[in-house]
Structures are given as structure tokens and as C-alpha cells.
Regions:
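A short aromatic-anchored loop/beta-hairpin motif
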Residues: 15-208
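Short, Lys/Arg-enriched N-terminal segments with co-localized hydrophobic residues
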Residues: 1-14
Length: 208
């Protein structure tokens, strides 16, 4: 049965602060679970990091099935897509959403522009056709132990295997077309991240 739970975030200083940012799997990602994925990091502190994939739609279960399993009353017209959030806690339903609607349990991030909620109440509101304007319903999540994500970014097996990073972009995350291919957003993110990294290196060369 699908479950929802609440959580509190303790923000601490990390070597690399990825909280509220997008992690993009490199083209040579060695872990098949993360190939061609874009991950929104909703927590990053000294205990580790957690995020949800935002570009992999689930064929099953759909929103109707999740509501039925959780005994959540759903209006027939409400049937949002469900996204595969990651390879752990695959029975946990989360909602990544705009902050025009939040609960006391919502984790607000990115200058309060986006929230991530692990709370049954959010699912109940959405099932009534209410709630935030923009949302991604996720099933499962990605998780890293303390310092693990920093190590994967700073000291990968080869430079080509390092995660790419982008600032959060509402249009990228919530602007995905309903009929777009799952890889479309990943390809756009890789392109943007490479351009950003190239500009950063070029700027550093001129400064030095």
C-alpha cells in the first residue's frame, strides 16, 4: 500500500550545496538506475541528500490506482501523471509543487518558489481537483549517504561520470509537454549544464 509521511529538514552547511538544484546524469552515467535522469534535490545536509527524478513518467501505477490503494477519494476528472521518483522507498508518494498552496509539513525550497510534500493530506487535496497550480506526483526517491553525493560530484571515477548541476528552472520541471519524450528534458538539461560549465571555465581563465 502506498504511504505518505511528513519530514522535517535540518539545513546544514555542506561542501557542495545541491539543495534546491537539479542534478543531471552525465551521458556516461555508470549506474543504470540513473541513466538519462534529472533529479531535483529537496534535501542536502550533513546526514546526506535526497531527491526525486522529474523526467520519468510511470506507466503504472497511475494516479487512480494510487488513490484507490490509499483509500483516497478522487473526483473522476482528476487523473494526474505519476513520475518515477527514484529506486528507494518506491511505495512512498511525494508531490513536488509550486508554493501557491502548501501545508505545514511542506518543505519549501529555492527561495520559497518550490515545495516538496510527503503528506497524505496533499494527495487528498489534489484528488479533489484542488491544490497547487504546478505539481509533479512522484513515487519513490533517490538518496545518498553523508558525503556520498559530494564524492560523486567532486571525485567520480572519471570526469565524464560526474553529475552535472543546474539551478532550478520552473519551465524545465513543470513545463514538460504531456506528449514529450522522457529524454527531452534530460537532453535540454545536459546542453544547458555543459554551456554553463564552459562559460564558467572561460570566465575563470580570463580572471586568472
Amino acid at each position: 500500500q502506498y504511504t505518505q509521511f511528513t519530514t522535517q529538514i535540518t539545513i546544514n552547511i555542506c561542501m557542495i550545496d545541491t539543495q534546491g538544484k537539479l542534478l543531471i546524469a552525465p551521458p556516461n552515467m555508470p549506474d543504470p538506475r540513473f541513466r538519462k535522469t534529472v533529479v531535483y534535490i529537496w534535501r542536502h545536509d550533513v546526514s546526506g541528500a535526497a531527491g526525486v527524478m522529474v523526467n520519468k513518467k510511470c506507466q503504472q501505477p497511475d494516479f487512480k490506482h494510487i488513490c484507490n490503494e490509499g483509500l483516497v477519494h478522487r473526483l473522476p476528472k482528476v487523473n494526474h501523471p505519476v513520475y518515477y521518483g527514484g529506486p528507494i522507498l518506491t511505495n512512498v508518494v511525494g508531490v513536488l509543487h509550486s508554493t501557491d498552496f502548501i501545508l505545514t509539513s511542506t518543505n519549501t525550497l529555492t527561495e520559497d518558489k518550490v515545495g516538496f510534500t510527503l503528506d497524505r493530506k496533499m494527495l487528498e487535496v489534489i484528488a479533489k481537483g484542488q491544490g497547487p497550480k504546478n505539481m509533479l506526483i512522484t513515487l519513490g526517491m533517490a538518496s545518498w549517504n553523508s558525503s556520498q553525493l559530494e564524492e560523486e560530484i567532486e571525485h567520480p571515477h572519471t570526469p565524464a561520470m560526474s553529475w552535472l548541476m543546474l539551478d532550478y528552472d520552473e519551465k524545465l520541471v513543470f513545463g514538460q509537454l504531456a506528449d514529450s519524450k522522457p529524454d527531452d528534458i534530460w537532453e535540454e538539461c545536459v546542453s544547458r549544464a555543459i554551456r554553463s560549465k564552459t562559460a564558467e571555465i572561460t570566465s575563470k581563465l580570463f580572471r586568472d
